[in-house]
UniProtKB/Swiss-Prot annotation:
<feature type="transmembrane region" description="Helical">
    <location>
        <begin position="197"/>
        <end position="217"/>
    </location>
</feature>
<feature type="glycosylation site" description="N-linked (GlcNAc...) asparagine">
    <location>
        <position position="268"/>
    </location>
</feature>
<dbReference type="Pfam" id="PF04922">
    <property type="entry name" value="DIE2_ALG10"/>
</dbReference>
<feature type="transmembrane region" description="Helical">
    <location>
        <begin position="112"/>
        <end position="132"/>
    </location>
</feature>
<feature type="transmembrane region" description="Helical">
    <location>
        <begin position="247"/>
        <end position="267"/>
    </location>
</feature>
<feature type="transmembrane region" description="Helical">
    <location>
        <begin position="285"/>
        <end position="305"/>
    </location>
</feature>
<keyword id="KW-0325">Glycoprotein</keyword>
<dbReference type="GO" id="GO:0006488">
    <property type="term" value="P:dolichol-linked oligosaccharide biosynthetic process"/>
</dbReference>
<comment type="similarity">
    <text>Belongs to the ALG10 glucosyltransferase family.</text>
</comment>
<comment type="pathway">
    <text>Protein modification; protein glycosylation.</text>
</comment>
<feature type="transmembrane region" description="Helical">
    <location>
        <begin position="439"/>
        <end position="459"/>
    </location>
</feature>
<feature type="transmembrane region" description="Helical">
    <location>
        <begin position="379"/>
        <end position="399"/>
    </location>
</feature>
<keyword id="KW-1133">Transmembrane helix</keyword>
<dbReference type="GO" id="GO:0106073">
    <property type="term" value="F:dolichyl pyrophosphate Glc2Man9GlcNAc2 alpha-1,2-glucosyltransferase activity"/>
</dbReference>
<feature type="transmembrane region" description="Helical">
    <location>
        <begin position="413"/>
        <end position="433"/>
    </location>
</feature>
<keyword id="KW-0472">Membrane</keyword>
<keyword id="KW-0808">Transferase</keyword>
Amino acid sequence: MGGEATASEKELQEREDQLSQQIQDEIVMGCVVNLALWPVLLGAAAYVAYKYNCSWVPYPFIDEKFHVGQTVRYLAGRWREWDSKITTPPGLYVIGWAVQRTVGLLVGWNTLSLLRLSNVIGGLVVWPWFVLRPLYFFNALAFWPATLSVFPLLTSYYFLYYTDVWSTILIVGSLTLAVTVPFGERASIWASAICGLLSCLFRQTNIVWNAFVLVVVLERRTMIHKGFNSLRINNYLKLIIHGIENWNSLVLPYAVNFALFLIFLLYNGSVTLGDKSSHVAGFHLVQMFYCLLFITFFSVPVWFCRSFLLNYVSRTVVYPIWTIFEILGIMMIIRFFTVVHPYLLADNRHIAFYLFKKLIGRNRFLKYFVMAPIYHFSTFVYLEAVRPTVFFFHPILPIEVKSPVDLPLQFTHISWSALIICTLLTVVPSPLFEPRYYILPYIFWRIFLLVSPEPFFAVPTEMTYRFGNTRRLAVEFLWFILINAITIVIFATNAFAWETEASLQRIIW
């Protein structure tokens, strides 16, 4: 019996060693691939940027006419002038001013090209190297920085002068500083809060994501110092207590942001800075389903496998009445909480226009009997893809990690709940179906998500103990490249005239 036990222990140890080696190989492969892809992406982006500026849209495009116009005022020294049509604070224009004043001394480009360059630099240098790369080492088996650098909803705006790129860089950068603490805990938390505050100068709703970062900051320290366990309500109380006990070092930096934003609200009377009549907040609950639909679509390589689909089918079979009531509930939400903004139906320069006109809102059959089950499945994907990756806590024993910097980038039930709440708070009040609003909900969901090592089409009997994520991560990268290629082709080959615009118009996200 002793010999059998020894043999079994030896076999188990060999499997653990093999798994450990496979994980190391995956991490090394990921690093090598990301380093190799970056110069290729940089070269491709340079070509696309050249086509944007010299061929396709060598003039301010859609919202650029407002952004460029305001930046030109700053370049002329007219800092007190403001275009009342602009809805966001002036963060983008300060960056554009800085790029024009510095890079403009070295090259003879026109002002529009220089302003667009600020987003190219942000999207292909700052975003992958200074924001995603540090997070990658906390969850190296989950995502590739190169892949999130070509996330389609974000990539489209690398070549235009829009607020989304730097808004994303700064608020996700706030999370990066809070997790990686590169300057020591106190200085890093303050730097994180400052990044979060600066992000609100690009998009006001980023104040909500400041709250998400604060939750992550608190939970990563509370689970160590207070000892999270399997009693979830108890963990929430521990987090609140730890926040009160460490108010000055952990909470105060973000509380300053919330206080400043409250002052802004009282002064401005609205979240929207200008053109308030066209951006009135409401209760557009269907917007959450639009968001989950996009998340499901973009994350297909992450969750798609036979067992995942079978789990959804088995759930509907085992709980048919419950599933029917859920879908009926979604239909009721579609019926009573759908907002069709006039801009959506009037602007055929956005893919959202065609999605709504041809699919989502084409007729009652598609709207209710096709889209409701799709929304139901998207909700399942959003929730179930995360479930296996959430921290598991022992009923009694504390976790072995002693420092927050040694924790992986992983959800607990608290941060997972916070992400859902923050997503609701940022997308539901918006009356406009605008895919750009889903960038941050997707990014924050994706970077915490562990990728299943299960092969795409494997049946349970074919499963092995071999660990491997490279194939899925590679497919995810190629999936994004394919989507980007299609959207660029659509943009390049579909030019049409508007009576109210002097230049040709094109189609973007």
